[in-house]
Amino acid sequence: MVIALSDSFIENPRSFLQRFQDALFAGSKPDLQGTLGIDEEVSNIFATEERIRKIPNYLDCKWSELKTGQLLRLQGMVQDTNFGHEFFAGAVEVNENIWRGCRYILDFSEDEMHLDESKIVLDERYSLFLTNVPGERTLPVIEALGNWGSESLKERSLKYSNRLQASNDTGVCVKCYGGMETKVQVCQAIDVIGIYEEPSEYSDGLPILHMLCFKDYTQSATQAPSPQQAEIIRPKILKYFEKVLGENIAAESLMLALLSNVVHKTTGLVIGGFTLNLTNCTSELVSQLVSVLRPLIKRMVIQKVNVAELNRKPLYPLSDGETLDTSHLQVAPGTLIVLDETELSSGTLNDVGCRNVQFLSSLISQQDLTFFYPFSSFTVHSNVRIIILSHGRSILPADVGCRCRGDSPDTIEFPTDSDELQEFCNFFHMWNMRANIPENMLDYIQSTYVSSRQYNKEINEKTLSLQINCSRLYAKSFGRQLVSRIDFEAARSLINHWTVN
């Protein structure tokens, strides 16, 4: 019986990696620059979703049963790309001109540990701190820590609680080889295949995953609907939104905001993003809306915006120069951020509160997520979706405002049929789809703009930009990748009901 290479690799990954390195170094002193082709080899072995699913998922395993050296898969967000750097023996000369590769090989014989320096080629690795994708999935970390059977490990893990957003979140140290750390960005959600190493005093109680390869983890794999399917699903979702918001225009506007996606960004200009401010909201309405959105949007965080909350602690990632504290809004691309202003009243902001407002304004208007250090700061691009729920006009710079009903709706009976619910989820997976404007539509849009300006001088380039952006979102809501006249005219009509900020 022939065993598939993927099955053989899962059963004994270190044996495969040892043979691969030994063959690569045969007859010559190793050059340890780059990944050695290991990442490509592993990616090819697990090139299909069927093969990848055979790899045990770290989030589904009982931690007490995990053993050093086994192959694991893990999805998470990169909280910090600068979590450590170390040198180690990347290869050793076991006989004259016969070299043994040591990358990913976590056990050494006594003889190999006491070799002369001339018989060792040094390698280096960089560490990332990976945690749960905010708003997506959590683990009962206390129970898991108990599985390790050591109170001292449990205590040491608390050292990194400042990097975790919730008490039941977990952190993993991911070690990168051959420059792979340069391909990863902070806040990026990644899907990693690697070699597991059990927590120890050496790792300060953190589990370790030695990265073999990774890919971007946008969201759980789903099948976006076809245009025919989207046309059927769309009105069903709008029906639920309208029940909560009480207005068809507000429901349509919310749908477009949930499908927004930054497609291009230059200094001072963000294309594709769409921040909606729903006004006339109550706390009860917010609660109902969140309960409707939560099963549909796989990454969603709720942030109250009031004086007490703004003054309480930073909403931005903050470093003291030694360690990086996470924040509630250090989130991965594609996350929906719901800003709840319904409890906002007059008051005085302290220094933290002022910085939080500045941070939120930059996040909304520029899609910049700012990290603050003692004497500097830096920003990373953040492709997030944002809706603001408030009584009156928001204190934050939303693109448009739209009034909803305001009174508390009756209990919403959301679909319990799993297939229909999955269809709804798949619909909003279209947020990262791109709808383009064909050449013939560009001429139509330009002529329409010129004609509109003759009758209404208040229509300007900002209005035109909003019309174009919303026509793209409208096309996406029907599963179409090309904008039509119908989409553009529908967007123009919708904008007439908005307050453009």
From Swiss-Prot:
Keyword Chloroplast appears in the UniProt entry: no
A GO biological process held by the record: nuclear DNA replication
Keyword annotations of the record: Cytoplasm, Nucleus
Record flagged with keyword Cytoplasm: yes
Location(s) in or outside the cell: Cytoplasm; Nucleus
GO cellular component: a single term: chromatin
InterPro entries assigned: MCM_complex-bd
Pfam families, A to Z: MCM_bind
Record protein name field: UPF0616 protein C1687.04
